[in-house]
A protein has these predicted regions:
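Hydrophobic, well-ordered secondary-structure elements that form the walls
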Residues: 69, 107, 128, 140
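Catalytic cores of alpha/beta
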Residues: 55-56, 115-130
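Conserved SAM/AdoMet-binding glycine-rich loop
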Residues: 1-104, 113
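C-terminal structural cap/anchor segments
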Residues: 98, 105, 110, 124-127
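An active-site-proximal structural segment forming one wall of the substrate-binding cleft
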Residues: 4-5, 130-132
């Protein structure tokens, strides 16, 4: 980081990791603070319970200005089905800790997850509205569920009431498998 700052003058860093571990971010923050490196940085995380208010403040003190994380669906039932390892209450607590420390929070959200009902979606929208209202998140983006072959859904589609549509044999990327509902839902 020091070499890049010295060579380019750039002081803004986006650390690209879909789920940067809290322990690694703490080590980064401690090192940035000990070296007195005046940078701004942001990254991507899971809203893990180990992101305490104290850790969020330490990250802010080290120059962290924003975090993005996957809330996906604001439903404990669906989060469990997705095997996300977080709860809605935990996400609210962690996002509030980041926001209280002055770190902007962006939430990735989805709709159309297998077994997700219209009511689940309406409830999720209301919960997200409350997260905005209470200053827990500052931005969010909804996207339609996409099935990847190595996700829990892609590995066991029948457990989610879907059947994967076979990909053409010459397909390189397997990031968006088509599927049909076997349960009659859509």
């Amino acid at each position: 980081i020091e070499a890049i700052v010295n060579e380019t003058g750039q002081t803004g860093f986006h650390f690209v990791d879909e789920a940067a571990p809290p322990k690694a971010l703490k080590a980064l923050a401690d090192e940035l603070i000990s070296r007195q490196l005046p940078i701004s940085w942001w990254g991507n995380i899971r809203f893990e319970k180990t992101f305490s208010p104290e850790l969020c403040q330490l990250l802010a003190d080290s120059g962290c200005i924003a975090m993005s994380g996957g809330l996906e669906v604001a439903s404990d039932r669906l989060l469990t089905l997705m095997k996300k390892g977080v709860t809605v209450e935990q996400v609210a607590r962690v996002t509030k800790g980041f926001s209280d420390a002055g770190i902007l929070v962006h939430a990735y959200l989805m709709y159309g997850f297998p077994t997700q009902t219209v009511q689940d979606t309406v409830d999720a929208l209301e919960y997200v509205r409350q997260l905005f209202e209470n200053g827990c998140i500052q931005s969010g983006f909804f996207h339609r569920f996409s099935c990847t072959v190595h996700s829990p859904v892609g590995l066991d589609p029948a457990a989610y009431g879907i059947e994967l549509i076979p990909l053409p044999p010459d397909t390189i990327a397997k990031n968006d498998n088509g599927y049909i509902y076997t349960s009659g839902e859509d």
